[in-house]
């Protein structure tokens, strides 16, 4: 069988789903809240300002994909043929000349 992984980045969390590419059946899924979002960092609700840190995107990507795959039958990971990303909107990221997000610099 062949599988695909879908990742959905929302305002406060991200979700990963593993789907059978031939039937469309959902095999497993996982959700994780952005750690820095949950700590209230980079957000100012009084002025409707909500931001995410790039490391949160990486952290939840690693967690949700591994977690979803851990719930699948053995051999699923070796048969993933595609991965797709979805976001709630545009997420501009300021980078240095090498393309590294400024928030990731020491």
Task: Give the role of each language-model region.
Residues 1-104:
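N-terminal glycine/serine-rich phosphate-binding loop of ATP-dependent small-molecule kinases
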């Amino acid at each position: 069988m062949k599988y695909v992984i879908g990742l959905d980045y929302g305002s406060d969390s991200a979700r990963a789903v593993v789907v059978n590419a031939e039937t469309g059946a959902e095999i497993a899924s996982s959700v994780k809240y952005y750690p820095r979002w949950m700590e209230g960092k980079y957000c100012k609700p009084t002025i409707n300002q909500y931001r995410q840190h790039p490391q949160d995107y990486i952290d939840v990507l690693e967690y949700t994909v591994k977690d979803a795959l851990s719930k699948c039958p053995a051999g699923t990971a070796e048969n993933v043929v595609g991965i797709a990303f979805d976001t709630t909107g545009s997420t501009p990221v300021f980078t240095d000349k090498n393309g590294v997000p400024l928030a990731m610099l020491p």
